[in-house]
Amino acid sequence: MEEEFPTISLLGIDFNLSNILMITVTCVIVLLIAIICTRNLQRRPTGKQNFIEWVMDFVRGIINSNMDWKTGGRFHVLGITLLMFIFVANMLGLPFQIAINDEVWWRSPTADPIVTLTLAIMVLGLTHYYGIKMRGFKHYFVGTYFSPMKFLFPLKLVEEFANTLTLGLRLYGNIFAGEVLLTIIATQLAHMNIFVGVLAIIPALLWQGFSIFIGAIQAYIFTMLTMVYMSHKVSDEH
């Protein structure tokens, strides 16, 4: 199923306007959630404050399961941002898809491998940055690529490449597959008679609910693996 997207060319580089739009929408939604949930903070949290504190505690648990809080506390905001951004991005394309003149404008940005691989490269880049910053270049390089044995260096390089690919493509594959199946179901419903169409709505809603679950799980997995990779780079025992 070939899809077309609106693009704009700058300096010979094509930019996907759909991705730009959806990433912007995702950022705005996450920002609004953060602002709304942190307004008028109370000592005894209720409602929306409970939600944001639950997210913070959830990410804290992810970090504590991979490294001590003294080391990992600085990545708390990163984890919260990744979890919320990816979850919201995964949800945007589930209710509907908008296409104008056969060009798709509205869908989940994480259904594009360029977006997910960019996220993965950013995350792996941060792990290297903090590894060097916290351990020093020599200690980091030797400990990461030549430990426990020097002949493992080529395999360590392959591992870095594989981690980037799997982190990005896992997220893309799950979200893209979910949206493709929802599109197929919606197309089939449009060609059914009213009675059969009403009955077919039930499995469509069930699949949409399952897709929400998958989107949440993928946001968790991406955040968890980010902290796993980070702990490998910044902790001496790894």
From Swiss-Prot:
Subunit annotation: F-type ATPases have 2 components, CF(1) - the catalytic core - and CF(0) - the membrane proton channel. CF(1) has five subunits: alpha(3), beta(3), gamma(1), delta(1), epsilon(1). CF(0) has three main subunits: a(1), b(2) and c(9-12). The alpha and beta chains form an alternating ring which encloses part of the gamma chain. CF(1) is attached to CF(0) by a central stalk formed by the gamma and epsilon chains, while a peripheral stalk is formed by the delta and b chains.
Identification of the protein by name: ATP synthase subunit a
One cellular component (GO) term of this entry: plasma membrane
GO BP: proton motive force-driven plasma membrane ATP synthesis
Species this chain originates from: Listeria monocytogenes serotype 4b (strain CLIP80459)
Keywords assigned by UniProt, alphabetized: ATP synthesis, Cell membrane, CF(0), Hydrogen ion transport, Ion transport, Membrane, Transmembrane, Transmembrane helix, Transport
Membrane-crossing residue ranges in chain numbering: 17-37, 80-100, 112-132, 194-214
Source species, domain of life: Bacteria
InterPro entries, sorted: ATP_syn_F0_a_bact/chloroplast, ATP_synth_F0_asu, ATP_synth_F0_asu_AS, F0_ATP_A_sf
Name of encoding gene: atpB
Membrane protein topology class: Multi-pass membrane protein
Any Pfam family hit: ATP-synt_A
UniProt key word Ion transport: yes
Family to which this protein belongs: Belongs to the ATPase A chain family.
Residues of the signal peptide: none
Annotated localization: Cell membrane
Molecular functions (GO terms): proton-transporting ATP synthase activity, rotational mechanism
Function, as annotated: Key component of the proton channel; it plays a direct role in the translocation of protons across the membrane.
